[in-house]
Amino acid sequence: MKPFLVTLAVLLLFFQVTAVGSIEKCWNFRGSCRDECLKNEKVYVFCMSGKLCCLKPKDQPHLPQRTKN
């Protein structure tokens, strides 16, 4: 039982360390939260942290076009 608990503790510590250095993701993990978007990215929504959710054009949702009546 002791080796199991030690292994579990090491794995939990490993996952916490790697999560700190990762970039915050948004829009179903398709976008990245940044202060400024890259040249080929566009802003679609805001992240929970207040940063911009930057999406590449291929990952942006297709919005319906308004039709004139």
Swiss-Prot record:
GO biological process, one term: defense response to bacterium
A GO CC term attached to the entry: extracellular region
Chief site of localization: secreted
Disulfide pattern: C26-C53, C33-C47, C37-C54
Keyword Repeat: no
Compartments, record wording: Secreted
Signal peptide: 1-19
Classification via InterPro entries: Beta-defensin (IPR050544), Beta_defensin_dom (IPR025933)
Keyword set, alphabetical order: Antibiotic, Antimicrobial, Defensin, Disulfide bond, Secreted, Signal
Record carries keyword Transport: no
Its job: Has antibacterial activity.
PANTHER family with a match to the protein in the record: BETA-DEFENSIN (PTHR15001:SF5), BETA-DEFENSIN 123-RELATED (PTHR15001)
Family membership: Belongs to the beta-defensin family.
Protein name according to UniProt: Beta-defensin 122
Organism field: Macaca mulatta
